[in-house]
């Protein structure tokens, strides 16, 4: 156990050296954006009612890290879940559809989990949730995956996402291209 704690503390130390650090407890927000990547598109719709959970080590919340050390929680998923417990969002939304961590987040406080597709899917580039078997693209199934709403480009892509335990899949086209006026 001591070896695990030491490895975790060493990893945190090196992350802190490379990351921006936040010391205060996360504040309550109605919406939590999971992963800063592509969040600028979501921010246009959300105004100031959101916060961002940084998932690529660009920013680390020391308050959450300390809480997790005290509780002997050492994984990234546990860090994310603890962060969510403090923010208490009604909605967790992401524009990153190929991060398995999003699908594995615990559902507490009756929040809704929403995923918006931002790119085309391919098992060549998205090996985290897609696989290619005998020339056929399939979704990596996991009983623990869960998401309430997935907004996809079209019904064909929607068929792939059905296997991610989504309650509802909605076709909206590309949210990025919807920012441009047709001439």
Predicted regions and their residues:
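Donor-nucleotide binding loops and adjacent catalytic segments primarily
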Residues: 183
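Active-site and donor-binding regions of nucleotide-sugar-utilizing enzymes
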Residues: 4-180
